[in-house]
Amino acid sequence: MSEPIFDRTMAFAGILQAIGQVQKVARHGQADDEMLGACLGTIMVTNPDSTADVYQDKVALNRGYQLVLNQLGDDKQKDVEVTRYLIGILALERKLSRSSNAMGMLAERINQVHRQLHHFAITDEQVVANFAGIYSDIISTLGPKIQISGNPEYLKQPMVQHKIRALLLAAMRSAVLWRQLGGKRRHLVFSRKTIVDTAKKSLTL
């Protein structure tokens, strides 16, 4: 199970899992608390012994695997919005990985959240706002902002904005891991079948 392709596909599913929740919040104004918690929890696992340590909620990750099948499979379920968010996240991740200053600030701010979690649940509004602040201060300054589509009435609400930014930070965490595990954008074109087959196997494990 610790084969590189399984680990890479797990991290890629983690990106899409978070992006799927971004869409849900942007369109409906709220996220499933368990899914939100699962996504945000990945940010806090900074020194994992294995990739599976990062994604401890298998049910939540299965939604990510399903999106892998939808986006890279041969059926007609591809979502151009998901693709656009994915491209934006991967572009920002490249800039992040090249900036030791940004990476250092990110680690420092995540440590602050660790302390906050002694007093609050990870889905508490104050914690979510903190994650959102990390994304705004460190990630979104690295390059073009990701334009989020959704219901304008919800997108105006500060808590909705916080959840979306917090989930984008979770997507970024998985993108960093995916790259560390050898993931490259060209794999999404030339190794599509392998990734899809691996996602299918992972869904049944």
Curated annotation (Swiss-Prot):
<keyword id="KW-0472">Membrane</keyword>
<dbReference type="InterPro" id="IPR007451">
    <property type="entry name" value="HflD"/>
</dbReference>
<dbReference type="Pfam" id="PF04356">
    <property type="entry name" value="DUF489"/>
</dbReference>
<protein>
    <recommendedName>
        <fullName>High frequency lysogenization protein HflD homolog</fullName>
    </recommendedName>
</protein>
<keyword id="KW-0997">Cell inner membrane</keyword>
<comment type="similarity">
    <text>Belongs to the HflD family.</text>
</comment>
<dbReference type="InterPro" id="IPR035932">
    <property type="entry name" value="HflD-like_sf"/>
</dbReference>
<dbReference type="GO" id="GO:0005886">
    <property type="term" value="C:plasma membrane"/>
</dbReference>
<keyword id="KW-0963">Cytoplasm</keyword>
<dbReference type="GO" id="GO:0005737">
    <property type="term" value="C:cytoplasm"/>
</dbReference>
<keyword id="KW-1003">Cell membrane</keyword>
